[in-house]
Amino acid sequence: MKYIITLLLVALLFSCQEKSTQEFLAFGDYRAELQISKTEVLPFTFKVKDANNLTVFNAEEKIEVNEIEYRNDSVFINMPVFEALLAAKIENQTLNGNFIIEGKGRVVPFTAKKSKTRFNVEAKAEANITGNWETLFSPDTAEDKYIAKGVFKQNGNQVTGTFLTETGDYRFLEGVVNGTDLKLSTFDGAHAFLFTGKVTDSTINGTFFSGNHWKEPFTAKRNANYKLPSANALTYLNEGYDSLAFTFPDANGNQVSLTDDRFKNKVVIVQ
């Protein structure tokens, strides 16, 4: 996969050399799309402030990006913190290229053009999903299913919110209810999430996409009083134990135990 990614970058650089005119990102609002399947695109929006600075928007979240490199007719946008790159050719204020996470060997087709609209709306929302939702991901697969809590705020067609899980959340989600269709997305470089589904005032049945490498179904029902289990209850000692107890060999074959003198009266972190 790394070989394929290298070929993609070389091909893009070669196309740059065929055109000597230097191109830059034009100021303004853009709508980007990641082609995560044959039928689904994951949209997000960003604003170019100048040739070297842009802002990615996900609901209340604003991600400032300032590592932008130009080579003739192409741009290479390095997302902050994460090992992620948007590499694209610039033509008539339109971008065509790939979203690349080289460390994980992932490549997703990427396009962007001038627009402020994240999701198109064609119909009045037939449901309002503001509130709390008791959610189950992969409900029909015993080894994969897990619980979550959907928390949303809807104003007309526009929706923001997230899914909370026992170990975190699904970032800042932004989207719409279009008739009975729900669509939510977020993109920050490390995470590229899309949620689609059918909604009523009391139920949601949909699909969660993570980039182009993972998808799973989910169901949700409105429950104003729903709470996730306490985070303090996720890790516990088995019955009959009042502390951790283990012994294992270190790199030199010496036995290491939590009861060794060197650990007494010290804070020990076990991962």
Residue ranges of model-derived segments:
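Short, structured interface segments
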Residues: 95-121, 206-232
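A short, compositionally biased domain-edge/stem linker segment
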Residues: 16-20, 115-122, 228-234, 253-257
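N-terminal "domain-start" segment that seeds a small globular fold
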Residues: 223-261
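Bacterial Sec-dependent N-terminal signal peptides
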Residues: 1-27
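Alpha/beta-hydrolase fold active-site loops
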Residues: 265-268
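Central antiparallel beta-sheet cores of small beta-barrel/beta-sandwich binding domains
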Residues: 24-90, 119-199
